Swiss-Prot record:
Entry cofactors: Mg(2+)
Protein name: Hydroxyethylthiazole kinase
Taxonomic source organism: Granulibacter bethesdensis (strain ATCC BAA-1260 / CGDNIH1)
GO annotation terms (biological process): thiamine biosynthetic process; thiamine diphosphate biosynthetic process
UniProt entry keywords in alphabetical sequence: ATP-binding, Kinase, Magnesium, Metal-binding, Nucleotide-binding, Thiamine biosynthesis, Transferase
SUPFAM superfamilies given in the database record: Ribokinase-like (SSF53613)
Gene Ontology molecular function, alphabetical: ATP binding; hydroxyethylthiazole kinase activity; magnesium ion binding
EC number: 2.7.1.50
The reaction(s) this protein catalyses: 5-(2-hydroxyethyl)-4-methylthiazole + ATP = 4-methyl-5-(2-phosphooxyethyl)-thiazole + ADP + H(+)
Residues holding substrate: 54, 202
Role this protein plays: Catalyzes the phosphorylation of the hydroxyl group of 4-methyl-5-beta-hydroxyethylthiazole (THZ).
Length: 274
């Protein structure tokens, strides 16, 4: 993990550096994601500068997870074969030393996926990204969610996030009106984003995938998560300026990711520091 002081200026410059590095290296991001967002996720990764792959067959995930630069696991649409593929891929990625990002969609609302998420947590993913209800439920403190929606503010989940981060040895991101990332010691808030983003399905899942892209080029999981959430939030803000509603927001979001650069980051990245 970095020993640099996490000032707002440092975080912005690090995000700029990582975005440049990501676009040079075009990391291969292995996604086992949900059926609702596969197209959106792949296009967002391409727009950012990464290379997406949606390999989920149990016959292929072991070898592909070792080949890829990072692995993103999303529990949005569950089935027994997908669960088996997730377990195989996570084990392979961990053995190969590749970063793993877990998105525990609807954990706390449905028992099967809650049990699966807790099993996957034992493999110690580098980064966990969820809404407040999901993070609280994953930490074992109940929930209050309605699937992908959260009835709890992101600040209410900070203690649970810290517990999870210490348990995994990685970072936990809690997304909401303000996003927060902690590794159990450090805490960073990201205040970028726009309310219209909640009217488009899958942008939270997309944020997880973008975190996976940054994790492929940044060894510090907290910094990788911060960079991914900042990029997502900024793209959402820029898209909302040009969009007439949720439909056009989806298109504008991809264009904004593609256009994201150092000038935009220096001008508009908003960090919330303790």
């Amino acid at each position: 993990m970095t020993e640099e002081p996490l000032s707002a200026a440092w975080l912005t410059e690090r995000t700029i550096y990582l975005l440049t590095l990501l676009r040079e290296k075009r990391p291969l991001v292995h996604n086992i994601t949900n059926l609702v967002v596969t197209n959106t996720t792949a296009n967002a990764l391409l727009a950012l500068g990464a290379s997406p792959a949606m390999v989920e067959g149990v016959e292929e995930v072991d070898s592909f997870a070792r080949m890829a630069d990072s692995l993103v696991i999303n529990l949005g649409t569950m089935s027994s074969p997908r669960a088996a593929a997730m377990r195989l891929a996570m084990a392979a990625a961990r053995q190969a030393g590749k970063p793993v990002v877990l998105d525990p969609v609807a954990v706390g609302a449905l028992r099967y996926r809650t049990e699966l998420a807790r099993d996957l947590l034992e493999a110690k993913p580098h980064i966990v990204r969820g809404n407040a209800s999901e993070i609280i439920a994953l930490a074992g403190d109940g929930g209050g969610g309605r699937g992908v929606d959260s009835l709890v503010s992101s600040t209410a989940a900070l203690e649970a996030a810290s517990i999870l981060a210490r348990r995994t040895g990685g970072a936990v991101a809690v997304t909401g009106a303000t996003d927060y990332v902690t590794d159990g010691t450090r805490l960073i808030g990201i205040a970028n984003g726009h309310p219209m983003m909640t009217r488009v399905t899958g942008l939270g899942c997309t944020a997880t995938a973008l975190i996976g892209a940054f994790a492929a080029v940044e060894p510090d999981p907290l910094v990788a998560a911060c960079a991914g959430l900042c990029a997502t939030g900024l793209a959402g803000e820029l898209a909302a300026i040009r969009a007439d509603g949720p439909g056009s927001l989806q298109v504008e979001f991809l264009d904004a990711l593609y256009a994201l650069d150092s000038a935009i980051l220096r001008d508009a990245a908003r960090w919330v520091l303790p």
